[in-house]
């Protein structure tokens, strides 16, 4: 979609929401998890790799705040960091994800060590963080608008996983429940920023491209997991049966 004349705020929001057709809820890997066709290894691999994304989110949000001169925006945006890191003695989303890891049979060290993070996942997530560091704060903030589609994917896991995967412990689902309300709150703020900032056809086109970039990141993460856990072709599988890839955050 190429915008030639500036869209009204409502029409621009509709264009943003239309990008949901490319959300990773439609990826074959996620469809398999939803339908109960994923193996234990595939569920564990997803949880372990997605943890790298989870731990990068507060770094991304801190980068946005560092580039944002507006105190009112920073006061709102900081809540996203607190949601993941925790505050006032309450655990945040990262701790909740660690409990999800334990619920699917992984140890906390399995996740914290990052040894299961595939290179393709790491590259995709690092690209997101680097974009947030280098882009203007408005564009970086609006790259988070995949949150438009997040409540649906969290609810789909709550609806299907307990039925299909009774071996997953109930306490592992807290993260998905907590994000249902948090994501809706974040969407409201993010949409308001996007509609206020994108006041020309040029800016609207660029923001749609940025949202597609974020969708590409999420889709590419699942492509990497498909190669490793569905097709049994992890990196270097033709030369070794060991995990030979780098396992530390270098960026």
UniProtKB/Swiss-Prot annotation:
Keywords, alphabetical: Oxidoreductase, PQQ biosynthesis
InterPro entries in alphabetical order: Haem_Oase-like_multi-hlx (IPR016084), PqqC (IPR011845), PqqC-like (IPR039068), Thiaminase-2/PQQC (IPR004305)
Pathway noted in the entry: Cofactor biosynthesis; pyrroloquinoline quinone biosynthesis
Keyword Transmembrane assigned: no
Catalytic activity: 6-(2-amino-2-carboxyethyl)-7,8-dioxo-1,2,3,4,7,8-hexahydroquinoline-2,4-dicarboxylate + 3 O2 = pyrroloquinoline quinone + 2 H2O2 + 2 H2O + H(+)
Pfam families: TENA_THI-4 (PF03070)
Biological process per Gene Ontology, one example term: pyrroloquinoline quinone biosynthetic process
EC number of the protein: 1.3.3.11
Oxidoreductase among keywords: yes
Enzymatic class: oxidoreductase
GO molecular function, one term: pyrroloquinoline-quinone synthase activity
Gene3D superfamilies for the chain: Heme oxygenase-like
Family per record: Belongs to the PqqC family.
Function: Ring cyclization and eight-electron oxidation of 3a-(2-amino-2-carboxyethyl)-4,5-dioxo-4,5,6,7,8,9-hexahydroquinoline-7,9-dicarboxylic-acid to PQQ.
Protein name: Pyrroloquinoline-quinone synthase
Organism, scientific name: Klebsiella pneumoniae subsp. pneumoniae (strain ATCC 700721 / MGH 78578)
């Amino acid at each position: 979609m190429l915008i030639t004349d500036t869209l009204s705020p409502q029409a621009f929001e509709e264009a943003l929401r239309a990008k949901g057709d490319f959300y990773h809820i439609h990826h074959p890997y996620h469809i398999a998890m939803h339908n109960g066709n994923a193996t234990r290894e595939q569920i564990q691999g997803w949880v372990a790799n997605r943890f790298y994304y989870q731990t990068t989110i507060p770094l991304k949000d801190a980068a946005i705040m560092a580039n944002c001169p507006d105190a009112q925006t920073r006061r709102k945006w900081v809540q996203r960091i607190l949601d993941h890191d925790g505050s006032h003695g309450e655990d945040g989303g990262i701790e909740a994800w660690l409990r999800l890891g334990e619920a699917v049979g992984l140890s906390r060290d399995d996740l914290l060590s990052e040894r299961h993070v595939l290179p393709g996942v790491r590259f995709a997530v690092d690209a997101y963080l680097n974009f947030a560091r280098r882009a203007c704060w408005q564009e970086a903030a609006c790259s988070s608008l995949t949150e438009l589609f997040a409540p649906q994917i969290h609810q789909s896991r709550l609806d299907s996983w307990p039925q299909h995967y009774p071996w997953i412990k109930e306490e592992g689902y807290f993260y998905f429940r907590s994000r249902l309300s948090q994501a809706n709150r974040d969407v409201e703020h993010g949409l308001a920023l996007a509609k206020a900032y994108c006041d020309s056809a040029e800016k609207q086109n660029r923001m749609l491209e940025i949202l597609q970039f974020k969708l590409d990141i999420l889709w590419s993460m699942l492509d990497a997991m498909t190669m490793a856990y569905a097709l049994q072709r992890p990196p270097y599988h033709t030369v070794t049966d060991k995990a030979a890839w780098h396992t530390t955050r270098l960026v």
